[in-house]
Amino acid sequence: MAAKPSIPKGTRDFSPVEMAKRNYIFNTIRDVYHLYGFQQIETPSMEMLSTLMGKYGDEGDKLLFKIQNSGDYFSGITDEELLSRNAVKLASKFCEKGLRYDLTVPFARYVVMHRDEITFPFKRYQIQPVWRADRPQKGRYREFYQCDADVVGSDSLLNEVELMQIVDTVFSRFNIRVCIKINNRKILSGIAEIIGEADKIVDITVAIDKLDKIGLENVNAELKEKGISDEAIAKLQPIILLSGTNTEKLATLKSVLAASETGMKGVEESEFILGTLETMGLKNEIELDLTLARGLNYYTGAIFEVKALDVQIGSITGGGRYDNLTGVFGMAGVSGVGISFGADRIFDVLNQLELYPKEAVNGTELMFVNFGDKEAAFSMSMLAKVRAAGIRAEIFPDAAKMKKQMSYANAKSVPFVAIVGENEMNEGKAMLKNMETGEQNLVSVEELIAALRN
């Protein structure tokens, strides 16, 4: 007996209806990116591991899918190394490539490699899949699409403002109510300074970024495990639990971080971004959230995250400023900021809230019934005119029984069927049937087109 086929955990197949929904998401995001002057690029699915490793922190590096070298990859490995059973060390010997973890690091690599061809500031967008060796669960997949927009070659905070406008516009078009959360890595660095743990900034941010998932008690336990003193943890509590309006939070931070030049710079940047956005009249809520600490090594300024308000799911968009990212590829002094829409989670949110527009998921609008070669030839001439008018139409390929053809149309949710028999051909017309109401009318091809366009 043949083995039952399956797909890897954390991956999915998509039906035609699901693909129509996904394309609605991609096209909506793409249209908004174009409105703001972004241009599209693509990069390979696989990158050199030297490009990927060390860019996402220790936790991120563990989630990289590594690609085994072809050929006799054991030839350069000693018996001693094999017997050591050190998986990380062995992997470095026979894996030189990996699947991309996100689109930001490959983009930084692209900028460095193509610097002489790029006009700066460079506004690029990219819609491609990424892979993470994560534990699959609701809303978390091992293969998923990201829809990134980044600006490199400009320090201006107007870039952050525009990216938040893009987020607001996209989710307004989707009719998804969201909260846009913003923080600044400099504020987090300032907090680490004033509690006397400046050298533990990465440990602190990785821990407090988990606050929503594991709770305050477990965050504090993790901080203690990392060697952060009880006194420092106590000082941290009122800061990360700070409440009030954005203006009130900023006022408190100005007082708390007064002794930290880095922290005050972060407050200044956040104040500019939030103040400018306030004059733009965003449709969605924006919140300064000090627990937002996106545990990635490359963010250096503003950081963003977007949560859906009407459904329980993780972050559906995130991003931030990464001033030093291209430096690791030999191109210093290039500042960048970007956002990434999680298309797969947005897909789930739109499904749960039933927010897909009917026209976005409709496929064939009109099907011609096939009674035989002569009728099919007549229908094909009408079909050409219908398609030229931009109507999605098809003809049933076989002269099957009427019941089978109608069942096919119903299964595909085709709203109209055109019936062409001998009588219709004699009049040069078709019988147009509304599949929802059952109403039938004898129409010319021009009348048929007009009926479907109305």
Curated annotation (Swiss-Prot):
One of its GO terms (biological process) is histidyl-tRNA aminoacylation. The keyword Protein biosynthesis applies. GO terms for molecular function: ATP binding; histidine-tRNA ligase activity. It comes from the Bacteria. Keywords: Aminoacyl-tRNA synthetase, ATP-binding, Cytoplasm, Ligase, Nucleotide-binding, Protein biosynthesis. Its EC number is 6.1.1.21. Pfam families: HGTP_anticodon, tRNA-synt_His. One of its GO terms (cellular component) is cytoplasm. Belongs to the class-II aminoacyl-tRNA synthetase family. Homodimer. This is Histidine--tRNA ligase. It comes from Bacteroides thetaiotaomicron (strain ATCC 29148 / DSM 2079 / JCM 5827 / CCUG 10774 / NCTC 10582 / VPI-5482 / E50). The lineage of its organism: Bacteria, Pseudomonadati, Bacteroidota, Bacteroidia, Bacteroidales.
